[in-house]
Amino acid sequence: MTLDDLNARYARLAADLGDQGIRVNGISAGPIKTLAASGIGDFRYILRWNQLNAPMRRNVTQEDVGNAAAFLCSDLAMGITGEIVYVDSGYNSVGMTFAGDEE
């Protein structure tokens, strides 16, 4: 399943379940320092890259993602469904660049 497939499923579920008052949203988190992530080779370099290149110049924490999830589950987000919320310090807004890319 591709990321586009997954995003389409959120939208389809939101459309199908909205009339029952069920909201469906997703969270796309940036790299997070976790026990599981420590098993990824050179993960510290991924974190460093993200910190240097994300607009907010910081990495995402587990608390950041939890706060976004709590918001989406709360009454404050009653009008939000079928969305993917990026919790990545803005990295998704600048896109991926590679060494040698010309500006």
Where are these regions (language model features)?
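C-terminal helical subdomain
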Residues: 7-8, 26, 45-80, 89
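Short, conserved catalytic or interaction motifs in soluble domains
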Residues: 19, 29, 74
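Short, flexible catalytic-loop segment of classical short-chain dehydrogenase/reductase
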Residues: 28-39, 87
